[in-house]
């Protein structure tokens, strides 16, 4: 190989560039000085990868608040299964969010935890043995079956009062009136009821609440029912009456889609933050990034600056950091 040939191959291996990128240097947090938690969070902006996405999400959530946006918080039931329940309850107690959209499992587990705790368990266990012992597994969280025995009794008493004057009620009325019966400062439903924050639950039957409603209808009163269209109207109105809307979607599924779909009626949400481990490649709603919602008109696309962010991470790791950075940073 001649010297000229070597020069050509070198150019392939180490291509030259005269460009000076006008972007920040990649740099992480300096632990050598006095530790500052919020400076650590700020350093995520130049850390790269998902840390920088988290920093973007913090900035966008701060903008929601500065813009006095109507903030929607959507969450799946596993969020309430975990210790994130207390994080969500804090947001609701402090009136940091205006609308909650969630699943029936979230309501179920919030109610149970007002009386009986969930317990830390393990991922790798003998499932058949757990079944024999009356223990249900949610990842590495254990839920003894006696929790559901207690829940059934509690709900039957509630059903009698709830359906006494009206046979057909909405999920938001269900959540509000049920929350008013609870006595636990860490309850999402109690704090929502106290602060008049609506809790929308479009799939109210998709958990033990649905099971117990079935048995109540079979054994006590076949005329009771749940009306979801009135709630859908009300959810659309939340967006239409708002000057600005912002979405914080923790997980996906029905809650996330109800938030973005009802914002379509107003021309799209102004801000959106997603936390998700969903995979875009399967074409599912759960894996769809904010950009896909832009194509449907469910989220606005602001050319001037980013108005949405996706953190591809498991929520128990990053949601508390988002809350700290966006709501608690002085």
Swiss-Prot record:
Catalytic reaction(s) noted: [eIF5A protein]-L-lysine + spermidine = [eIF5A protein]-deoxyhypusine + propane-1,3-diamine
InterPro entries for this protein: Deoxyhypus_synthase_arc, Deoxyhypusine_synthase, Deoxyhypusine_synthase_sf, DHS-like_NAD/FAD-binding_dom
Gene: dys
Documented EC number(s): 2.5.1.46
Cofactor(s) demanded: NAD(+)
Gene Ontology molecular-function annotations: deoxyhypusine synthase activity
Protein name per Swiss-Prot or TrEMBL: Probable deoxyhypusine synthase
GO cellular component: cytoplasm
One annotated GO biological process: spermidine metabolic process
